[in-house]
Amino acid sequence: MDLIRSHVMVCGGTNCSSSASGEIIREFERQIAEKGLEKEIKVVRTGCFGMCEAGPVVIVYPEGAFYARMTVENVTRIVDEHLVKGRVVKELLYKEAVDEDNKVKSLDSVDFYKKQRRVALRNCGVIDPENIDEYIAFDGYKALGKVLTEMTPQEVIDVMLKSGLRGRGGAGFPTGMKWKFAAASQSDKKYVCCNADEGDPGAFMDRSILEGDPHVVIEAMAIAAYAIGADQGYIYCRAEAQL
């Protein structure tokens, strides 16, 4: 097994992608391969980190160095100085990512993040959205496993009703009620439909979670399917979404 000493997390969300994050990823991969470091350094395309105004965003672990407004031209400096020599390129860091003593601050100590408690977006910017193993490593599909082995469909619906969870749309309709009505509906065939269409121009709520943590959507749909008696599901999103 290769021992990875550094992870280069590059935002692959819609905003950063429109600012050439794909080219940045390819340039990191090219230069790392040229130096024969591909078994030591892993480049990961992640979902949105949330701070789109600072994009393209690159975070290098284990230091947690938060590089903002990255360009293809700056990749060489980070590879040569940070990844090869172990020296963080502080002048390329986000302005709040260095403290008064000129030390690198953790991401959660930056003002934008320190009061946040991510729930639905907890894995965005943390895992490779296309790698199911990384999702499982962060307790992915654990809830589905519990539902299928320890709970009846009605018990799942009861939990949803008690939770008070509501839809993210304007109506805020209780999710548990939706599942209750769907379960009670008599039909030979039932489906779970995920409406991932952004109703408002310029909105990125649904797109962010689909791009950054698609397995959490699939897991939730599977739980819903079990609760209401469905065996198929569909995700609806617009064709222009670059997922």
In which residue ranges do the predicted regions lie?
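Feature of Fe-S/electron-transfer and energy-metabolism proteins
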Residues: 1-243
